[in-house]
């Protein structure tokens, strides 16, 4: 098991699934990555570090990566304001936001439908990785 202590919710997404272990990792933003954990990530030797944040989010909290890891950094921005727009639209329309789960379900659907080119690129990168790790993240990891 990979232990990254300085980044929120760093985890292997294969846990509990039929995916191969230790290939695909998800976490919150990497701006808090400390020196110890930078070395851990370097030792993983990931094929790619994919950042789904938009430029405004990156500007506020850039990933703390070594030059070795920066070479593997890929930004595939997905608008973080999508969820905010959805909640605001529900309020404007007079709808009641029934539950957190429903809003998240709708936002995930919108993330897919409104950013097909990003997801296409993401899956292309996964196919090219040839058994090397991929780390992906957004701002806060849910």
Regions of interest found by a model, annotated:
Residues 134-142:
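A contiguous pocket-lining binding segment that forms or flanks enzyme active sites
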């Amino acid at each position: 098991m990979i232990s990254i202590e300085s980044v929120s919710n760093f985890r292997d997404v294969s846990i509990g699934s039929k995916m191969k272990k230790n290939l695909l990792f998800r976490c919150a933003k990497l701006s808090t990555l400390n020196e110890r954990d930078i070395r851990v990530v370097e030792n993983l030797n990931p094929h790619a570090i994919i950042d789904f944040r938009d430029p405004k989010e990156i500007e506020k909290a850039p990933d703390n990566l070594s030059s070795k890891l920066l070479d593997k950094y890929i930004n595939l921005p997905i608008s973080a304001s999508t969820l905010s727009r959805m909640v605001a639209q529900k309020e404007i329309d007079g709808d009641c936001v029934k539950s957190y789960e429903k809003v998240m379900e709708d936002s995930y659907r919108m993330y897919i439908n409104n950013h097909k080119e990003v997801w296409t690129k993401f899956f292309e990168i996964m196919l090219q990785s040839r058994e090397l790790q991929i780390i992906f993240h957004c701002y806060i990891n849910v």
